[in-house]
Amino acid sequence: ISFSEIVIYELPENGELPNPNENSLLIDLVETHTTTYLDVEYEYYIIKINQGGSENSPNFSDKVRVSYEGVLMDDTLFDSSSIPVDFDLTSTIAGWGRVLPEYNNAENFVVNIDGTVTYNNPGIGIMFLPSGLGYFSAAAGSVPVYSNLIFKFKLYQSEFNDHDFDNVPSHLEDINEDFDLTNDDTDDDSFSNFVDSDDDND
């Protein structure tokens, strides 16, 4: 399935769904989730087009390999990559670290004779993010301030991050389990646990 095949339309004025055998109402597909970020509670929404065939899914602080398409609420495209690209989820907007762990990685992959890679049964979805889980009051490229965002994406692979190379995956250094690695400092030395290889001063 390609991103161009995932299309969101406004219902006609009569409220009737065109071609119901081919289309679905968003209300029947959307999952509502809540999270707290910077002391504010947010609702965000996801659609699971395909869960993904692997038994593994990323953690909020992992490296991920994805393709994606980001649009504003008026369907203006502001960012995309049709080929797989790698991200550290700690360096993306907060919404990605909440949403991608809800999906599984691709079941497997094949390296083709031309050197390209085909991923089979990846996680495929759509996320609807409030501005507070996006760029909020900061304009980013063509994204205006306080913009709600929509991303279509495919999740191919993920890998544990260990930012301080202490053999403890970074997601396990989130002691208070709030999806924020920067506010966990076990030994009070002003270095967050995930970048402090001796966070217990032993």
Regions found by a protein language model. Name each.
Residues 36-40, 45-65:
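Short, glycine/small-residue-enriched coil/turn segments at secondary-structure junctions
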Residues 1-47:
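Acidic/polar, low-complexity intrinsically disordered N-terminal segments immediately downstream
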Residues 158-202:
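Extracellular calcium-associated, cysteine-rich motifs in secreted modular proteins
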Residues 64-66, 125, 149, 201:
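Short beta-strand segments enriched for Tyr within beta-sheet-rich domains
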Residues 55-61, 140-145, 182-185:
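Short consensus segments that form the blades of beta-propeller domains
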Residues 62-74:
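A short beta-strand signature
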